[in-house]
């Protein structure tokens, strides 16, 4: 019986560590994509400004709207992410994982997977809107 309990503890710890490592990997992927997109924010602003300088292109132009939607989706992502994961809690504070149960780690993992999908969606909006705006600019130059 003693061996069964020891085996259970080892498996449980192993699973917790696996979830923790998965969470860290997801978290790092999300942060890298976030940082890359933050660098693109300037490009969105520049493309929008250049488009608005063209006669006949107004704020209600589809390309302008898409650039605004992309920018706002990033703002919403950052707000939602920071509301969900404060700096003093896991996974922002990686040291706190020792105090978490497997179910808590799993919940964090599920939330991180949702945020990964969300930041991927933001990235798609950035790519599509910048490409569309740049095509208009390239056609005029």
Task: Describe the role of every protein-language-model region.
Residues 1-7:
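Sec-dependent signal peptide recognition
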Residues 6, 18, 79:
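Residue-level marker of positions within ordered structural domains that often coincide
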Residues 14-62:
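Immediate post-signal-peptide N-terminus of mature secreted/exported proteins
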Residues 15, 39, 76, 82-83, ...:
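Generic detector of well-ordered secondary structure
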Residues 63-119:
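Long, amphipathic, charge-rich alpha-helical segments that form helical bundles/coiled-coils
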